[in-house]
Amino acid sequence: MKKILYVFLIMILAVGCNNLSNTPINKTEQMLKKYQMLDNDVMEDLNKTVDSETTFSEAQKTEYKNIMKKHYQNLVYEIKDDTIDGDEAKVNVLITVTDFKKVLDESEAYLNEHLDEFKDEYGNYIASKYVDYRLEKMSEAKEKVKYTIEIKLTKVNKEWRVDTLSDETLDKINGVYKY
């Protein structure tokens, strides 16, 4: 009889603990940790994005992936609050990421002021030189920026699921949001 009660108690605890992880906050943390841990889904998305980039050489694609991996691993977040309304929820998160937007803006300004540095001996603009320059500046970036992101979730079959992230949220996570 004790063994039956013991097994029953273990089952109740297992089911109860499983429900503890099924909260909007926990699902949001799991999603953000996927970035920090370079989860397969995150890497697949990064690879698809980079592979579709036609102006990057293979070496530049590899360099960009390495920069973004480091960026994701250094992502810092703080859950601020959550709001649950039936089967929908919103979780507000303060994230700290590398400020790539500033670097990209400065790189573009440099290009405009020093266009001759990115031309060949015939005066033709060489896009790959500029890409190399931007990647170098991104790899040197140290400044951080804080953004508040709103993660939306929907409960499907009693399970909270993170909705598709908005472009704005993705830009913030990637450090390129125009502020």
PLM ranges: what are they?
Residues 95-101, 155-157:
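Beta-strand elements of well-folded, non-transmembrane domains
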Residues 13-16:
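C-terminal motif of bacterial Sec signal peptides marking the signal peptidase cleavage site
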Residues 18-80:
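Core segments of small alpha/beta cavity-forming domains
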Residues 57, 99-145:
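Mixed-charge, low-complexity intrinsically disordered segments
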Residues 84-88, 157:
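Residue-level signal for tight coil/turn positions that link beta-strands
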Residues 113-125, 141-178:
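Short beta-strand edge/turn micro-motifs at domain boundaries
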